[in-house]
Amino acid sequence: VVVDGLKEMCFGSFEGRNYIEMEHDPDYLAWVAANCESPCPDGETKAAFSERICRAFSALVDKALADGEELLVILAHGGTQMAALERYALPHKDYYEWCGPNAGGFVLDAADWADKRVLHLVKTVQYTRETDV
């Protein structure tokens, strides 16, 4: 199921371009200098992105728990993971500290979700061709 609210940040005019292509772009340089907190031209701010992610993420967790699910798997971009974990995961970490491995993610425990709206980090995972699913 595709959840629109969990899509990666809208990078506006930066979309589809890499840092080498933009290394002399004044808008890009200003955005990086602001720690990527300012809005991308025609795109989202990190704050708006994080708020969108957290609304969709919490709704998914609420629904899964209400439906009696014991396992919820969300496959998402790294920025999406970082935004949700910065808000909801324990131990508390900064957005950028939640940057996981490529093809990786996190296993979380929702035991305290209903009362405290937090998820406990169980482990970090990284999938490879050899990973046994």
Model regions and ranges:
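Generic beta-sheet signal
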Residues: E70-G78
